Amino acid sequence: AFRVWLKKRYGTIENLNRLWNTRFWGHTFYDWDEIVAPSMVSEHFEEARSMYQAITLDYKRFNSDSMLANYQAEAEAIRAQIPDALITTNFMGAYKPLDYKKWAASLDVISWDNYPAEGADSAAAAMNHDLMRGLKNGQPFLLMEQTPSTCNWLNDNRLKRPGVMRLLSYQAVAHGADTVMFFQMRRSRAGCEKFHGAVIDHAGHGNTRVFRECQALGMELKALGKAVVGARVPAKAALIFDWDTWWALECS
């Protein structure tokens, strides 16, 4: 599949050699079949560093494009049955493997999962919120996931202190979130995320501090009505966040 992607991008093996400058260190390719995915047994000399940055950079592009093609195929299948469906998928902030800016055009609305660690710098979440909002030129986004209590993959699976979930939720709204949603509604009895937080814990009822906090937040957001939904704020400053540059810099 990588070779097919390269043929579409470069047309001929001669053009690929020219643009990759494969003459350096005698790395010229004479047939498409000679090209393999970069790894420690081919181009890499460290996990993320490459002898031939162009190959590694193109492989990262190919990986992102392949995942995007899979998403687009699934979106087409949904639209064939539900033409007016609003289609999105969970982004994960500044997630390195996928070029979210390229993906954005294929999503009806941007949505992402926010899971800051206990005591994490609030600026990191703020940057990720702004990154998500910028993907569709300022269009408000959806906070698709956050935990109301614990986060199962952290070293310390701590319960959020009183008020922290509310604080993080309003931070998202202030940065342009039109929804505040949770994963998960009811905690799983087994499986990978059985220790991940939920609105309804293993206790199985709503008489818990976490449930009451979620309930109170819902009432507060309902009281706001449409005052903030769809709101836009003219930006006075901007940051350029580019996946191609990120990839190229780190594999050099």
Q: Where do the language-model regions lie?
A:
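Carbohydrate-binding surfaces of carbohydrate-active enzymes
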Residues: 32-39, 72, 84, 93, ...
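Polysaccharide-binding and catalytic clefts of secreted carbohydrate-active enzymes
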Residues: 1-109, 113-127
